[in-house]
Regions:
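Short, small-residue-biased leader/transition segments that mark boundaries at the very start
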Residues: 1-6
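Short, surface-exposed amphipathic charged segments that create phosphate/polyanion-binding patches used
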Residues: 8-13, 32-45, 96-97, 172-176
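Beta-strand->loop->alpha-helix junctions that form or flank phosphate-binding loops
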Residues: 15, 21-30, 80-86, 163
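Acyltransferase
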Residues: 18-19, 27-66, 72-73, 225-304
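Terminal amphipathic helices with adjacent charged low-complexity linkers/tails
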Residues: 24-33, 91, 96
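Long hydrophobic segments that form regular secondary structure
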Residues: 62-122, 127, 219-232
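Cysteine-nucleophile active-site neighborhood
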Residues: 99-185, 190-195
């Protein structure tokens, strides 16, 4: 076919100009390996409130916003991104997301009044959940002796009795595990299995009455450890993708529904962990079909 001729000519031209082997041409694939919405579309959605209302604090350096896809997928759940105190309204749960600069974003929250408002909501018994940088913010102090971020030490929000020190070495790994036996407001999460990944610079040490929130196994090193923290209505973890498993997302909705006295038994989403795995399998099969896998493995083993 003419298209194959043009493709072959294009590959030859690229190899001639770059002096690098071209191992194939992958076609457009309609595969949902991550969220298709742009950040602008996601953040500019109407701030409508549904049966269960979850507010994510939209810090300036927000990262890993795909953490919230599983919650957004559940009918009857509204997930709103909030930048100002006036936008917060009266959510059932507040999430502090991951951030590229924990200390700067906490200072931003402090300056615009969102920190004080979140503290008031926590005092009323509202569920507060932090992921990675958002989890670090919940503690008592954040110290940066190596100038990984801004340097120095600042006061945290004080919702969890723990301290974080930023390290020079970055943690990057995949994990799986489960929620530990939680007491109080978040008891429904106890035992729920989770999987996700960690990517952070900090080490957090618990103290006082806080307990770890999850038990995880590093899928790379095999190391097992307890991670995160919880105390009463406040919970956090370093694990991104913590809501991907259907059991976790539905347990969160169940907790919030029970607090409001509404029936959420029909409010179910999809298992994002299983869905993503299926999509990755399709992607892998298609790439194998269109790429010179023998050449790729040869490069992996011997170099170019």
């Amino acid at each position: 076919a003419a298209s194959d001729v043009y493709k072959r000519q294009g590959v030859e031209m690229l190899e001639e100009r770059s002096h690098i082997p071209v191992v194939g041409v992958a076609p457009y694939l309609d595969i949902q390996v991550e969220d298709e919405d742009s950040l602008t579309e996601r953040f500019d959605r109407k701030q409508e409130v549904d049966l269960i209302d979850i507010a994510v604090i939209r810090v300036p350096r927000i990262s890993n916003f795909t953490d919230f896809n599983p919650l957004e997928s559940i009918p009857g759940v509204s997930l709103r991104y909030v930048q100002h105190v006036s936008e917060l309204k009266n959510p059932d749960m507040i999430i502090l997301p991951g951030t590229k600069n924990t200390m700067e974003d906490l200072l931003w929250m402090r300056a615009n009044g969102l920190e004080a408002t979140v503290l008031k909501e926590a005092a009323k018994g509202k569920i507060i959940f932090g992921i990675c940088g958002g989890y670090q913010m919940l503690g008592e102090t954040l110290s940066d002796p190596h100038h990984v971020e801004a340097g120095g030490t600042i006061k945290g929000m004080g919702l969890l009795p723990m301290d974080t020190v930023f390290a020079e070495k970055k943690t990057r790994t995949r994990v799986s595990g489960r929620f530990l036996e939680l007491e109080g407001e978040l008891q429904a999460l106890s035992g729920a299995e989770l999987e996700g990944y960690e990517i952070h610079m900090g080490e957090t040490v618990l103290k006082g009455e806080a307990g770890h929130s999850v038990s995880i196994e590093d899928q790379v090193s095999g190391e097992c450890k307890e991670d995160g923290a919880y105390c009463k209505n406040v919970c956090g973890t370093y694990v991104h993708g913590v809501f991907d498993r259907e059991d976790v997302a539905e347990a969160v909705v169940r907790v919030l529904g029970e607090k409001k006295g509404i029936d959420v038994s029909q409010m179910t989403g999809i298992d994002f962990a299983a869905f993503k795995e299926t999509q990755y399998d399709i992607l892998a099969a298609e790439l194998r079909k269109h790429l010179d896998m023998k050449k790729i493995y040869e490069i992996l083993e011997q170099g170019i």
